[in-house]
UniProtKB/Swiss-Prot annotation:
Region listing for Ribokinase, in residue ranges: 1-330
Pfam assignment, any one: PfkB
Protein name (record): Bifunctional protein HldE
Organism: Rhodopseudomonas palustris (strain ATCC BAA-98 / CGA009)
Cited InterPro entries: Bifunc_HldE, Carboh/pur_kinase_PfkB_CS, Cyt_trans-like, PfkB_dom, RfaE_dom_I, RfaE_dom_II, Ribokinase-like, Rossmann-like_a/b/a_fold
Family: In the N-terminal section; belongs to the carbohydrate kinase PfkB family. In the C-terminal section; belongs to the cytidylyltransferase family.
Length: 490
């Protein structure tokens, strides 16, 4: 039986040696509303910016974020960008950076200009030298890599074709790892898979796979056939082809392919998703899992990564919710116990760029009218918070005979619904304090209210949010249901 907790415990004992092209990823977010008078070029009104460790460094960050240790070997230039990356990697408790400085080249830096509203990339500017490292730098890289192999449980080569993974570095690293019985995973960039000869697993995306195999790779059967030929040439044990929204196909050498569909998710940014896949594959395989388990974990991690803005990492809690989607339906996870806990959830969602919705009510006896409102509310946002009147609040509003069910029971019923992400119980007569704290992007109520009657509408409108009124279902209300029950009517 699969145990996610046991897997996490095993992951925490693993050390991954990651070698590859380090870079700095910068994201400048803004909007374009006019053309420059100086040239036919859009003017970006910058609203904010983010800086992240990218490339193979993002692989290392994902390895560490999921709970394993990472020894990272990469190349930097003698510049401010390189020194910044060295400092940032050094501050990560689970990453041990071993960086080689090459004063003849700049540290790779990529700046992306992104539409804040649409999450679309408008422009990218690169600072880089992509030529292979010189012979003396190659030797320094190998001097950094080879002594670390004995400490590693698995080796991961992250090739961005920026000069670190030369043919010699690849060859000597794989040969030395094999002598020590270490498995090697390669996220390839070269169209010549033969240079990765002897690796355990190659993880190309569909475009890279098509270029390397000169096959159409239009169907899973075509991918499987071409992969067998490529594996014979590269002498590797398996090939995993990532296919974006079409999922992944893993082909073991001489075995039956395994196909995993992509998990449904709102894609915000695909930057670094391949890094996440490679990192999770490495740590899960190192932990002793089989191909299928590692592949499904990687697919779940990719779904989390692409739902975030920028170059992102995946945490164990996020992976748990994707691998075990029903685990997050437990009442103790969805029912908020304090303002501080609510703030922490909101902080995480906003960091991921998610649209937060809010609705509220007594929900004393759940009926189809409630379900319609909750379903419509969830459809208008990424995460839905339900404000629930406490028992004392219900008594003040509905009379001493209410509620029929106490607040904990009502909260647990709401928490069991797929449409509901959080339940927050409030003591006041109205949810105004909650709405002020949450500042939702969308506020939802039943259509028996007007927009002006919805508590908190002015707060939401002031922040540029929306107020959604959902048509009520005639004949369904808790008050009428209670009255009919007391009269013995059905």
């Amino acid at each position: 039986m699969f145990s996610f907790d046991a897997l996490l415990q095993a992951i925490a004992r693993q050390t991954v040696l990651c070698v590859g092209d380090l870079m700095l990823d910068e994201f400048v977010y803004g909007e374009v509303s006019r053309i420059s008078p100086e040239a036919p070029a859009p003017v970006i009104a910058v609203q904010r910016s983010e800086t992240n460790i990218g490339g193979a460094g993002n692989v290392a960050r994902n390895i560490a974020a999921i709970g394993a240790r990472c020894i990272f070997v990469g190349l930097i230039g003698d510049d401010a960008t390189g020194r910044f990356l060295e400092s940032e990697l050094g501050s990560e408790s689970r990453i041990e950076p071993v960086l080689v400085c090459d004063g003849s080249r700049p540290t790779t830096r990529k700046v992306r200009f992104v539409s804040e509203h649409f999450s679309t990339h408008m422009l990218r500017a690169d600072w880089e030298t992509a030529s292979p490292a010189a012979a003396d730098i190659e030797q320094r890289l190998l001097d950094a890599i080879l002594p670390q192999l004995a400490r590693a449980d698995i080796v991961l080569l992250s090739d961005y074709a920026k000069g670190v993974l030369t043919a010699r570095v690849i060859r000597d690293t794989i040969d030395a790892a094999k002598k020590l019985g270490k498995r090697v995973i390669v996220d390839p960039k070269s169209a010549n898979f033969a240079i990765y000869r002897g690796a355990t697993l190659l993880t190309p995306n569909r475009k890279e796979f098509t270029a390397a195999t000169r096959s159409a790779a239009a169907t899973d059967d075509e991918i499987a056939a071409a992969a067998q030929d490529a594996m014979a040439l590269a002498e590797c044990e398996a090939m995993l082809v990532t296919k974006s929204e079409h999922g992944m196909t893993l082909v073991p050498r001489g075995g039956e392919p395994i196909h995993v569909p992509a998990l449904p998710v709102k894609v915000r940014d695909v930057s670094g998703a391949g890094d996440t896949v490679a990192a999770v594959l490495a740590v899960v395989l190192a932990s002793g899992a089989n191909w299928a388990t590692a592949m499904r974990a990687a697919s779940a991690a990719a779904a989390v990564a692409v739902s975030k803005n920028g170059t992102a990492v995946v945490t164990p809690a996020e992976l748990r919710r994707r691998i075990l989607p029903h685990a997050s339906l437990a009442a103790e996870e969805k029912i908020i116990g304090s303002d501080e806990e609510l703030d922490e959830r909101l902080k995480q969602w906003r960091r991921e760029g998610l649209r937060v919705g809010f609705t509220n009510g007594c929900f004393d006896i759940l009926h189809p009218g409630h379900v319609k409102v909750l379903t419509a509310a969830r459809g208008a946002c990424d995460r839905l918070i339900v404000g629930l009147n406490s028992d004392a609040s219900v008594r003040r509003l509905k009379g001493e005979s209410r509620p029929v069910q106490h607040e904990r029971a009502r909260a647990e019923v709401l928490a069991a619904l797929e449409a509901v992400d959080l339940v927050a119980i409030f003591e006041e007569d109205t949810p105004l304090r909650l709405i002020t704290r949450i500042e939702p992007s969308v506020l939802v109520k039943g259509g028996d209210y007007t927009r002006e009657q919805v508590v908190g509408h002015e707060i939401v409108a002031a922040k540029g949010g929306d107020v959604l009124l959902v048509d009520v279902l005639p004949g369904f209300s808790t008050t009428s249901l209670v009255a009919r029950a007391r009269e013995g009517q059905s």
